[in-house]
Amino acid sequence: MNQVKTAFLLVAMTILLVLVGQVVGQMIGIGSAGIYVGLLLAVVMNGSAYWFSDRIALASARAREVTAAEAPMLFRLADRLAVQYGVPRPRVYVSPDPSPNAFATGRNPSHAAICVNDGLLRILDEEELYGVLAHEFGHVRNRDILISSVVAVLAGTITLIANVAQWGLMFGGYGGRDDRQQGAGGALVGLLMIILAPIAALLIQLAVSRSREYEADRTGAEVSGDPLALASALRKLERATQVIPSQTAQPAFAHLYIVNPLSGQSMAGLFSTHPPIEERIRRLEEMAGGMRRAS
């Protein structure tokens, strides 16, 4: 199902970029040539989204791949989880960001990466770190990582389109002198793009993020056998991200993280890409109670 949704998003990106190419072509006076520019851009963006979305996400976080000698505990826990999940151990990255957080990315379990922020390593104990890694491995095994990474590129593309439309309105004029009405119509569409594009990008992120976080919480807690450790980690991360702003997280990639990296910013909670931490913790505590009763 995730593969079908990913294909749908790639097709949607193609259609969007072709339409945008047509509108921008009218705005800057190149006519239907804008359609071909949009199609070419769609080919480039779709290829980048599928093959390089993980590299884009990791570069955005300024993450560096680490070795077992540099991060022995991370590798020990990751190797253990790889066996439990029955997947290859993902590549391990560390971001210098002091705001504690983590995310998984990649095309599939054989081409996956897990990134943890330096701030996370500083505040979590081993059990909590294990719970967070188990959550991220859940995304890998559930094959959430490709669609989430593609959505990140799509959201970034939509934001870029809004910026291009803004520059087109400022400097592109309103089409050729012989076609003022068409140019004015293109300008109106461009203005609507500026207003609606960021909202569309956010709605796409919301559509793929919230339910997957609940599922990764459940999967991670089941595999680790310790829902309360993950619940404790979520409490710490939620408090810390409120007071330690992220230095690397970009809005287009916010939905990848285990907790919203932009939660400390104004208006961030209005359309959060993540479900409420309180509800996630409640579900984990309920799981822990069920495990105790079953034992």
Regions found by a protein language model. Name each.
Residues 16-21:
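Hydrophobic, membrane-inserted alpha-helices
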Residues 190-195:
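Hydrophobic alpha-helical transmembrane segments of integral membrane proteins
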